[in-house]
Amino acid sequence: MTQEKRNLHKAPPDGGWGWMIVIGCFFVTVCTRAVTRCISIFFVEFQSYFAQDYARTAWIHSIVDCSTMLCAPIGSYVSNHFSCQVGIILGGVLASTGLVLSSFATSLEYLYLTLGVLTGLGFALCYSPAIAMVGKYFEKRKALAYGIAMSGSGIGTFILAPVVQLLIEQFSWRGALLILGGFVSNLCVCGALMRPITLKEDSLHYPLKQEQMENEPTQSGRLDSSCSPLCQDCSHKRLCYCTKKEYSFLLKPKFMVLAVSFLFLAYGCSPPFVYLVPYALNVGVSNQEAAFLMSILGIIDIVGNITFGWVTDTRFLKKHRYCCYLIAVGLDGLCCLFLPILTRFQLLVPFSVMFGYFDGAYVALIPVVTGDVVGTSSLSSALGVVFFLHAVPYLVSPPIAGWLVDTTGDYTAAFLLSGFSMIFCAVLLALAKIINRIKKRPKAVAVPTSDIKQEIWTNGDVSCANAINQKEV
């Protein structure tokens, strides 16, 4: 009881242990998103070893991303009903096990199950709960906190990309996966940092006090059989009410538009990460230079995370986060449209810089914009839904892009489709913003003509009109 009172806050503390939460979330994104990105470095190795085409090999990366996003609501459920610590530690065990088992793969189908499903499920149990915890600890500096936390994806990619390439060269792809499995087990340590916090806003959804529940202890969480049917019925209704309240944001028009836009965003953002290295190798870039492109993308991703988070926390831009987000998405899509004409390493470097910056910018704002729409109390559940919506696009976009590469013989169609998808996402959000602004304009109040008598005076040059309420005459 004392611990619960100590952890009950009227508002997010905006500091204190919150910075440890940011550090924990930072390493969660390193071990989940950065490792997922680095799986694309194994692409050529898998394709060569198993003698498969682009489309079949691309399913590995797709299934990892899809499993991570598809199972995100499970991560939110475990976080909401048990604790964030339990979810992340369990996820760390599953993800590490999946990577270790993948090192013994004998076929692509084996990798689909271990590297794809099992590792993806582990990442799902870690990712959304860790991100939601940052939102519970920060309000005024939320975008900056998220920028630092989400920069783990970029920093991790910058460091891990050349390291993974070196591990493959020294120990083969099997040894590299085994070492990555040990590295990902650090998610269990990150989970231990996630100290629970209860906000006053959250406690309003659970009106029964702890003392009231302690007076009548129950076994196994069940009501005693001597309880009246009315008591049991009230308990059931309260559970249903809490569940409905937890997901009431699904009916908000703003969230619906945001949800649809995520489908196009998720489709567009995945292929560039999967096919940047194979594309670079295809145009004559060396293995180390191709891996270095991913490192550049990763380090600039960090700059985008932190600078965009800091800038959008300023007084002037704080109320325009939504617009900053859609601009970043649109510019990221525009970068993809130019990628097919960049055929030298010197030209691919600027692409990695621009694409990485805007990718980091909008990724840092996804939980912020979502929180602005649904509120802090529903953020964990909302992020579960948001990442769930990423699942199908993440699953189908790399194989579709791979099919386009196999069919056309180059990467042009794949990158153009990716770019236009992200641009459409930005256009959709912009249209929704414009329509919402038009609806908010104050409407003129019509005055009944039956109660008004109009008198007009004129001097020949200027006419004056005066409305007199007949009821007062």
UniProtKB/Swiss-Prot annotation:
InterPro entries: MFS (IPR011701), MFS_dom (IPR020846), MFS_trans_sf (IPR036259), Proton-linked_MCT (IPR050327). GO terms for biological process: creatine transmembrane transport; creatinine metabolic process. One of its GO terms (cellular component) is basolateral plasma membrane. It is found in: Cell membrane; Basolateral cell membrane. GO terms for molecular function: creatine transmembrane transporter activity; uniporter activity. Its main location: membrane. It catalyses: creatine(in) = creatine(out); guanidinoacetate(in) = guanidinoacetate(out). This is Monocarboxylate transporter 12.
